[in-house]
UniProtKB/Swiss-Prot annotation:
Gene label: verI
PANTHER family, per the entry: AMINOTRANSFERASE GLII-RELATED, BIFUNCTIONAL ASPARTATE AMINOTRANSFERASE AND GLUTAMATE/ASPARTATE-PREPHENATE AMINOTRANSFERASE-RELATED
Keywords: Aminotransferase, Pyridoxal phosphate, Transferase
Enzyme Commission number(s) from the entry: 2.6.1.-
UniProt pathway: Mycotoxin biosynthesis
Disruption phenotype: Completely abolishes the 11'-deoxyverticillin A production.
Organism, as annotated: Clonostachys rogersoniana
Cofactor(s) of this protein: pyridoxal 5'-phosphate
Induction remarks: Expression is regulated by the cluster-specific regulator verZ.
Thylakoid found in the keyword field: no
Protein name: Aminotransferase verI
Record bears the keyword Membrane: no
InterPro entries: Aminotransferase_I/II_large (IPR004839), Ethylene_sulfur-biosynth (IPR050478), PyrdxlP-dep_Trfase (IPR015424), PyrdxlP-dep_Trfase_major (IPR015421), PyrdxlP-dep_Trfase_small (IPR015422)
Gene Ontology MF terms in the entry: pyridoxal phosphate binding; transaminase activity
CDD domains the UniProt entry points to: AAT_like
Amino acid sequence: MLSRRARESNAWFLERFKRPLGRQGSKSNTNIDLATAENWLIRPEILSALKRNLQADFQSSHLSYAPGLGGTPELLSAISTFFNHFFSPTIPVAPEHIVTGAGCSSVLDTLINDICDDGDGLLVAAPYWGSFEVSSVLRNGVTLIPVQIKFHESHSAQGIVDAYRKAMENTSCKVRGLLFCNPHNPWGHILSVEVIDALLLFCEQADIHFVSDEIYALSTFGRMELPSGNLEHGEKFLSPATSFVSVLSRDLIKLGGCLITQANKELRMSQAILNNAKLCNAASAMVAPILGSTSQLSTLVNLNVQRMRKAARTAIQFAQFHGLTFCEPVAGVYIWLRLSEDCHTRDDEEEIVQRCTKHGALVGSGSDYSESQPGWFRLTFAIPDNEFLEGLNRIETAMGYKERFNGEMVQSSLGGFVSQLWKRFVLV
């Protein structure tokens, strides 16, 4: 017999995710998955590097428990090198600032446990990744407070901060932090330095935590104001009361995640305790040499960016070809778009999902991300070219589009694509 806690948690999960759960169970292995946010474009090179490291560096000691609290010394040192090289933080990241875990979600679970009590709340811009609710509501009894922001209408830092402040004032629960996803999932955009600094100041004034989820920090390929990563900002805001926390699940290597807190030793220790013995020692041995070799990783990152840019261009061209409303991605592995302007209800949205599934293309619906307006969908483009084009063709069939996109469009002399550009949201 399950505990009361388990029964209540399971009931909540089955109700909250009943639509996506209802789409599972297909016996077909010919479906093309455009719903799951994974990067397949750099996998051959990553797999080769991991195999090489396993063969060259794996020792009998790696079959034992990992030494150290928060991660092995080798892995913590490699992660420190990684952050300092790629993000150039004002305050260098030291091994003692880092805690490793089994993945970004796992680390986020324990982090929310440490900064929130039952019934507390976290501010988060909507739409947002659905599993944020798993880490907050399911695991910790913490409420997510959606902050409705129309980024295509408001580009001012003050306007965005005002939206967070309004959401905080209108909620009945105690707000303990701001959950910041940058690059954003599912929009695929990056907020400006001005906005980030304004949000950090807001958190300091409100005496709440700033939690920065940056899992796509290295997958940036388009126009943006912020170089990559947020660690170079916020030095003047760092304090134990308003700790700047970075959660990064390495977007090239899904073999774990880590948390960084540079000013809160108490939080770092608590996180190290909660995540102790969670990360496989063998995984650490395979990943550490890659993260610690800046030259090797730079090559992989550059190659990944080239492939991501090409794939994103195809996704954008598809949306332009059919005159769809979309958010132009500059980071991440997906595009956020409307497959139909005649989608007005959640049932309409789910009907489109089912149609696409029937034709062998799995897509993510806006309701999965707490999008307030029905009709938005997330399509992952970081898969092999032929699979992505086939997936798009299946969507065309499902939607009844009269014309077929073949992956090519004529470019103007200015480099812009000939399309209905007025329907594009450039979110930078």
